[in-house]
Structures are given as C-alpha cells and as structure tokens.
Amino acid sequence: MDQLTDRPAEDARTRIQAKNRETILAAGREVFARHGLRGATLDEIASTAGMSKPNMLYYFRRKTDLYRAVLEEVLTDWLLPLDALDPEGDPIEELRRYISAKIKLSYEHPQASRLFAGEMLAGAPHIETYLSGELKEIVDRKARTISRWVSEGRLAPIDPYHLIFAIWAMTQHYADFDVQIRALLGKQTGKPGFQEQAAQAVLTILLKGVTPR
C-alpha cells in the first residue's frame, strides 16, 4: 500500500525535476550566449532561472557541466530535422522541409546558434567528442541518402557534405549575424513577412542548385 501511495509523489518529484532542469538549461543558453563560458557566472544563470544557486547546483555541479549540457541540447534540436530526411521521399521536398526547419530554428532560437558559433571559434573543446561521434554518424548517414538521390538522377550532381555545409551556413547566418542584417536592412527586418521572404530566398538559391536539369 505504501508503494502505491508513494508513486504519485515520486512522479510529481520527477516532473518538478524535469521542469527545473529545463528552466536551468534555458537560462544557461541565454547567459552563455551573451557572455560565453568564461564570462558567464553561475549566480547570473541561477538568477535568470529564478532559483537559488544551491538549488541549481543540485542539477549541475559545475559550470562546464551545464555548458556542455546546453550545447548538446542545441545540437540535438538541430539534428532532429536533418535526421528526419526520408530516403524514400521526394528529394526536393525533403530538402525544402529541412531548410525551412533550420531557418525557423535560427529565428526562434538565435541564442543557440550564437552559442554554438562561439564554441566552434574556440576549437570546440567541450563537444569535440560529440561532433566526431553522434554528429558525424548522422551526417554520414544523410550524406549517403543525398548521394543515392544524385545517383538515381533525382538531384543534380552535388557533393552531399558541401550541400549540408551550405545549408548550415545560409540558415544560421540569420542568427549569427542578426546585428549586421538589421544594420544593413533597417526597418525591413521588423516588417511582417520578412522571415518568410528570407526563407524563400534561401530555398530558391539552394533548391534551384540541386534540382535536376
């Protein structure tokens, strides 16, 4: 009887812990994107998360542990649309969905892109194993899918890795260089439809380049 009584309480604690962890990761993403690993402090992250520092340390004992968890969460979010490429689907439509999803991520989570860019510029010391492991595995698998589409004549001849790199570069530009874009385009960036206009430009450039002629 005690076990049945304890289970709802344990489930509630699990939900609270999951929610707290999610809150800490979101706060870490914001603060790390603003200050980098060196400039960020656990005090500021805890304040942003709306909890005490000791409470936060229950979930992440070191700043580097939290930083690594934030980066891995970012990469997981980014890899989901790539991993969703269906080898049996229409190549152009599959790429259209992927590119659109990447642009949406850049607009909705620009801090994540800037945080990742900072880690790359530093030589990726905290996620090098992740990059050469899980990331490489997914990219290699999807590169084989793109190569198959090319060999079947369903895509124009293109190196699959460089296509993936080009998609990353063009979509993440809108997050990494947001300040430059706003400086050059001014009020245009705040007008309704600007995001859709940017997405369509990227889609047109990339998809016309891989459409069989």
Regions found by a protein language model. Name each.
Residues R68-R97, V139-S147:
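Amphipathic alpha-helical linker/stalk segments
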Residues T23, A27, V31-D65, A69:
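Helix-turn-helix
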Residues M1-P8, K104, E108, K136, ...:
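C-terminal peripheral helix-coil segments that are non-catalytic and often amphipathic
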Residues Y107-T129, F177-L185:
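Amphipathic alpha-helical segments used for helix-helix packing
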Residues L115-E119, G133, A166, M170:
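Short acidic/histidine-centered micro-motifs embedded in hydrophobic/aromatic stretches
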Residues R21-E22, L42, T64, R68, ...:
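Short, structured helix-loop boundary elements
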Residues D83-R114, E152, P160-I167, E196-A199:
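Hydrophobic alpha-helical connector segments
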Residues N20, K63, V70, V74, ...:
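Hydrophobic/aromatic residues within well-ordered alpha-helical segments
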